[in-house]
Amino acid sequence: MNRVPALDRVFHERGRLALCTTLIANPDGISFTALQEACSLTHGNLNRHLHALAEINIVDMRRKTGAGRPQTIISITPQGRDQFLEYIDALETIVRKVQSAAEPGASSNRLATT
């Protein structure tokens, strides 16, 4: 039986996957409004996810003031980046194993999650 790596539950949810993917692509940070639009989340849902992720040092939220309205800028922390990339590596391993097992003539070994 082939062992499949465990997936970090912190990221294994559609909203958080979208959030972290967007934040990785915007290393200098992104406004709350732009992040909300990019991830197609409601204000309340995004706010809940961000506060949960900030509590475990995955994201950083800071207020930016200056010309115009103040904005909340969200960025992924170095720890968050490392953890998210580890999650993506584990997910890629699972995808490769499933693709290999699905090929014609593949052995009948079953995949097991840990």
Located regions from the model:
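Amphipathic alpha-helical dimerization/coiled-coil segments
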Residues: 1-4, 82-114
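Short beta-strand "wing" residues that participate in macromolecule-binding interfaces
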Residues: 61
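Short, hydrophobic-biased segments on the C-terminal half of alpha helices
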Residues: 50-51
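N-terminal helix-turn-helix DNA-binding core of bacterial DNA-binding proteins
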Residues: 2, 6-45, 66-67, 71-75, ...
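A cross-family signal for key residues in well-ordered alpha-helices
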Residues: 18-21, 54, 85, 92
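Glycine-centered, phosphate/nucleic-acid-interacting loop/turn motifs that mediate DNA/RNA or nucleotide
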Residues: 57
